C-alpha cells in the first residue's frame, strides 16, 4: 500500500464517514417471515424492471426467490416489529435500465436507506424519489444518471446522507442559473443533512453565501464539477464540518476563510485545481484550521513566507503547480508529514538533506522541477526508512544514482533525467519494489541479471541506450506493463513473457529484436496493447491451421519489420474487443494495474494517425483501437474479416505487397477515422460504400493499381489529390484526369456550343453587310445584353 494507516485514514475519511452513516442507520433483520405481501410485491416488481446480464454472482436480485421471506433476501432489511422494508442496499448488482417515475420502488414508503450505487440505471432521476419521505440515506453513486437533480429531494426532511457522485447531472436547461438556484435551495432545505457528495458531475454556477445554515454538515464534496465564483467563507463557519472537497472546479478569488469564532474541526480541505490565478493566496491563511490533516491547494499561486507555519498534525500536503521557486523550509517542522507533492513548480538546486529525516514520510513527489542533485552523502535518501513512493522524474538529476531505502521502497519514478552508465545493481536490493520507471535517460549496457530478484508489476526502460539480449530471468511473472521501446536490445523476444498472465501493455518498439512473430502472446488473456514496431521481426504472422485470437487487444502495431506471407480471410475473427465496445465478459475495458493508481506512471505509444506521428498517452489507451501492419512484406488479399473490426479508429496496411481488390467489408468500420492502403498492388475500384463512413477524415490509396472513377461522396472528394496519385487507371475529382464518360460528354457539349456559335456569327456578318453602322452598333449591343458570351466580347473588342 502507498501510505501508512494514519494517512490512509485521512485520505479515505469520507469513505469512513460514509460507513459510519450507513451503519448508524442500519436496522438488522430479525425474525423470519415478517415480510408483508405488499412489500414483497413491490420488491419483486422492482427486480423485474431491470435487466441483469447472466450469469453474475454479484447480482443480488438474482438470488431472490418469490416463495421465500423477502426480509431474508440479499440487500433487504425489514423492521423487526412491523415487517416493512426499511433498507435496500443493491450496490454492484449489475442492474441495467432506467429508474422509472412509476417504479415499484416508490411504493416502499417506509424506506429509510436506499443504496443503488455502481449500477447502470442510465437515465434521469425521477421526481418520484421525493415520495420516500422517511429516507435518511440515499446513495446513487456511479449510476450513469443524467439531467437535473430533482428539487423534490428537498422534501426529504429526514435525509442525513446524500451521495450522487460520479454521474452526469447538470445545471443545464432553459434557465441554467434558475436550475442551480433550485439545486442550492433544495440543499439548504435539508436541515438534518450531515453528508453531501455531488462530486464528479457536470454541475455549474455559484454556491450561496449562507452555507452555514447547514449547521449539521460534516462532509461536503462537490469536486470535479464547474462551480464558479468565490468560495463562500460561511462554509468554514460550520463547526461540525470535517471534510470539504471543492477541488477541480472553476472557483476564483479572492479566497477567504473568515473569522472562525469556534475551534474548527475541519480535517480534510481540498481547493486545488481551480482558477484562483492570478490571485496569490498566502499559505498562512490556513493556520487557524488547527485540526487540519489533509490540505491540497494544487494549482494555486502561493505565497510562502519564511515564518509561515501550518497545524502540526498535517499529514497530506498537495502543492503541485503552485508557482513555488524555493523548497518550502516550513516543511522541516512537519514531523507528521506522510504525503508531499511539490511537483510541477520552479524549484532549482539540490533537494535538502533534512527532508529525508521526517520520520513519517511515505510519499514524495518532486517531479517536473529543476533539481540537479541531493544534499548530503550518497545514501542520504536511505534516511527515509518508511519511504514507499519516490518520484524524481523530469528534473536534471545526473550521476550518481541515489541509494534508496532497501526495505520500504515500492514505487520508483526517475524518468526524464540525465542519469547515465549502467543501471545500478543496488536497485535489485529493493525487495518490495513493484514499479520501476527509468525511461528517457542515458542508461547503457545490459539489464542486470539480478533483476530476477525483483517482483515488478511495471517495468519501463523506454528511450535509453540499453543493449544486449534481454535476460529471460529478468521478466517478473507479475508484470502488467512492460515498455523497453527505443533502445538497442537484440536477440529474441523473451519467451518468459508467456508467464505474465496479467500483462496488459507490451511495447518493444524501435529496437533490434530479431525473431519470428510471437503468436504465443495470444495466450495472454489480458493483453491489450502490443507494439513491435521498427524491429527485425520476420516471417509469417500466423501459423497454418491455427486461428490467431487476440480477444482483448486494442492496439496492434507490428509496422516496419520484415513480416511476410498471406493473411487468411478469417485472420481477424477472434479479435473481440476491436469488434465491440465491450469485451468478451461484457465489461468496458479499462487499462488498470491492480492496487496501483494508473496516474502514477507514464505510458506512451507512438502511432501513425492520418499520416502524422502522434504520441498516445493517458486516457487515449481506453479510446483508441488501432491496427498498423505497414512497412512489411505481406501479400495476397486483404482479409475480408477486417470488416468485423467495427470499433477500429486507425487502420494502416500501407507499404506491403497486398493484391486483389479493396474489400467492401471495410465499410463496416463505422468508427474509422484514418485509413492508409497506399504503396501496395491493389487493383479494381475504390468501393463507393467507404463514403458512408461519416468519421473517416483521412485516407490514402496512392501508389497502387486502382482504376475507375473515384466515388463522388463527400468523405472521399474532400481528400487531397495526393491520396489517389500513382494509380494510372483512376480518374475523376480530386484528380485532374477526367473519366472517359466525362470526356465524351464534354466533347459533345463543346460541339453543340461551336455549332451555336457559328450560327450566331453568320447572322452577325449578314447584319453588318446590310445595315448601316449605327444599326450595326445597336444590334451588337442588343446581342451583347441578351447573350453575354465570352466569345462575343472578343468580337466586340475586335470591331472597336
Swiss-Prot record:
Residues 32-759 are extracellular. Residues 781-800 are cytoplasmic. This is Receptor-like protein 47. It is found in: Cell membrane. Keywords: Cell membrane, Glycoprotein, Leucine-rich repeat, Membrane, Receptor, Repeat, Signal, Transmembrane, Transmembrane helix. Pfam families: LRR_1 (PF00560), LRR_6 (PF13516), LRR_8 (PF13855), LRRNT_2 (PF08263). InterPro entries: Leu-rich_rpt, Leu-rich_rpt_typical-subtyp, LRR_dom_sf, LRR_N_plant-typ, LRRC69/RLP. LRR repeats lie at residues 109-131, 133-156, 157-179, 190-213, 214-238, 240-262, 263-288, 294-311, 312-334, 335-358, 360-383, 385-406, 407-430, 431-453, 455-477, 479-500, 502-523, 524-550, 551-574, 621-645, 646-669, 670-693, 695-718. Glycans are attached at residues 66, 102, 155, 210, 259, 323, 333, 365, 442, 465, 499, 514, 668, 700. Belongs to the RLP family. The chain crosses the membrane at residues 760-780. It is a single-pass type I membrane protein. One of its GO terms (cellular component) is plasma membrane. Residues 1-31 form the signal peptide. PANTHER family: DNA-DAMAGE-REPAIR_TOLERATION DRT100-LIKE PROTEIN (PTHR48057:SF30), LEUCINE-RICH REPEAT SERINE/THREONINE-PROTEIN KINASE 1 (PTHR48057). It comes from Arabidopsis thaliana (Mouse-ear cress).
